[in-house]
Structure formats: C-alpha cells, structure tokens
Amino acid sequence: MAASTMSICSSACTNSWQVDDCPESCCELPCGTPSCCAPAPCLTLVCTPVSCVSSPCCQAACEPSACQSGCTSSCTPSCCQQSSCQPACCTSSPCQQACCVPVCCKPVCCVPVCCGASSCCQQSSCQPACCASSSCQQSCRVPVCCKAVCCVPTCSESSSSCCQQSSCQPACCTSSPCQQSCCVSVCCKPVCCKSICCVPVCSGASSPCCQQSSCQPACCTSSCCRPSSSVSLLCRPVCSRPASCSFSSGQKSSC
C-alpha cells in the first residue's frame, strides 16, 4: 500500500514514513487538470480537500466527482438538484416568455405560453400571452388561443364577424353606456348592451336610427322630452306647456 501510494504522490511525499501524513497539497492540483476535485491521490482520510466549497475548481466544474458532496450548495444551482431537465428557460419568470417544449421545464413554473399563431396556444393550460394585457382581447382572435373565461373576442370593427359570435361586450359598446352614434344592431348583442341604454341613438332628426330604436332616441332629448333612459317609444314631454314641446310625426303629447 505504501509503495503504490508513493508512486502517485511521489512529488509531494518523498519518504515512505510520510505516506500516512501526506500533505494536503498533493490533492489540491491546479484548476483545469483532469484530477481537479478528484479522489485524493493519497490516503482518503488524510488527503481529501477540506476547502472544497471555497475551491475555485469545485465551483467551476460542477460535474459529478468525489468532492461534489462537499460543495453542492456552491457549484450546483438549486434548480439543478431537483430537476432532470434543462432549467435555464425557467429562471427568468414564473411562466416562459416564449413557447417552449413542456419537457424542458417543470410544469409547476413553466407552462407554455401563447406566442402569436403558434400551435403552443392550443396546447397551453396556462393563461396565454394574448390574454395578459386585459380581461378581454383587444381585437378579434381565434377563441382557442385564449381561455373563454377571460379572453372572449371583442368587436374591432362594426362589420366584423366577431361581433356576432361574441358573448362579451363588444368594442362598439365600451365607450359609453349608450352608443355615441348609430350602430348596426347586430354589432351589439342584447345580452351585453341593455336595451334601456345601449340601443342605437340618432345623430340627427332625419336619421333612420331614430325610427328603428326600441328605446328613447337622442332626437327627443334636445327638447323638453324625457332623457334617453326612458324605454317608452313616445317622446313624453316633461315641460309644463305643450307649446314648448317638439314632437315627431305620429307621437302624442302627455303634457
């Protein structure tokens, strides 16, 4: 045993009587050598490096070795210890910034997110990126891209087919409780635009929107008639004198 040990540690252990007391320097080879942080060339109980954690060669290697157990906390990321996959794409945020293969990261933190028209949208169980900006999408998108609970498509244009299929208040209704101008009735569904306030209002007395409205049109609010919140088809005046009321043809005064 002494002879074999002497041949390995001959540079540091010059005399046979020094074998059992081999200096620690024979184990602390320069960083970069194959035996760096390797099993001690002399007797293990004597020559195992005691400063493995602080050794620069341990921290740089991070490879399985005899001394890794002594410096795991320093040279092995915490994500590496429990994960069998590549942890790099998980460190930036709770969810990935771009579509990533699910096996790459642990599901607990790295559910794939939606990046544009990628197929990642269809398979994602996490709230995709196209839903993060607001409670409803800003423009019409394919429903499969986002969960229905938060991302019902909204109406971007009055002629958009998205209006007809939307169960959310479309864009043409969001500006105010009542529309600012005549709008095609199909654009705002009754389920989201209550007839008492959100039916089309007219921009002028001659507008056909007035005649088709199911609620008090705006052409009645300029006179002494009741405001547009009234559900009556008539322009009921609120003035004390009938002479001061302006009526459309076919309408009756209740003054």
Curated annotation (Swiss-Prot):
It comes from the Eukaryota. It holds the Pfam family Keratin_B2_2. Sequence repeats lie at residues 26-30, 36-40, 57-61, 79-83, 89-93, 99-103, 104-108, 109-113, 114-118, 120-124, 130-134, 145-149, 150-154, 162-166, 172-176, 182-186, 187-191, 192-196, 197-201, 209-213, 219-223, 224-228. Residues 26-228 are annotated as: 22 X 5 AA repeats of C-C-X(3). The keyword Repeat applies. The keyword Ribosomal protein does not apply. Keywords: Keratin, Repeat. Restricted to a narrow region of the hair fiber cuticle, lying approximately 20 cell layers above the apex of the dermal papilla of the hair root; not detected in any other tissues. One of its GO terms (cellular component) is cytosol. InterPro entries: KAP. Interacts with hair keratins. Belongs to the KRTAP type 10 family. In the hair cortex, hair keratin intermediate filaments are embedded in an interfilamentous matrix, consisting of hair keratin-associated proteins (KRTAP), which are essential for the formation of a rigid and resistant hair shaft through their extensive disulfide bond cross-linking with abundant cysteine residues of hair keratins. The matrix proteins include the high-sulfur and high-glycine-tyrosine keratins. This is Keratin-associated protein 10-2. It comes from Homo sapiens. The lineage of its organism: Eukaryota, Metazoa, Chordata, Craniata, Vertebrata.
